[in-house]
Amino acid sequence: VLSFKIKDVLILHDKKSVTVLDEQDRIVGEIKKTTVPGNEKGTTFVFEQEGVRATLGIKKGRLLFAAYRFQLNGEEFQLKDNKLNSVLYFCVSGTINRKIWNIEENQDQEIEVSVDGKKVALIKPKSFLGADLLIDAEASRHPLLFSLTCLMYFMLKIYREETEFIEDVMEEFL
């Protein structure tokens, strides 16, 4: 298992980037906010790393549950909130390259990334400004898995902000 860090910032805007660091604190990638036609404004991020460009964002037109558009070097894949579990915790699933992907919050509020039932990565959000990523050594060499894992941290942040807002609104009415 290899360890990486996402060094987040308070407010990420189009001109500012977040770095992804390896165990020796070397920059292995950068993440920026971006816009992609067909995605909700403010919900799309791009990961760049030596010849790899991946974007992940929330598709326009959702009511309650999100559909995620993941693009990597010209290919596009769709992931969706798991309608049963997403009401209770962050849970995204989909099929990429004929493999079933599950990205799911565990009891420790960490995100487990599984491919065909095998856990390949763990996102450990810190309370503030970043996350630690633990990724299977072999899996870390696959641009699709590595970039999607890094970008999913930002979808988790959006999910948490939105659920906090919904909880606040519900408290007003109860």
Regions found by a protein language model. Give the residues of each.
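Short, well-structured hydrophobic secondary-structure segments
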Residues: 38-72
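Helix-adjacent hinge/juxtasegments
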Residues: 62-92
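Periodic aromatic/glycine/histidine/acidic cluster detector
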Residues: 29-32, 55-58, 79-81
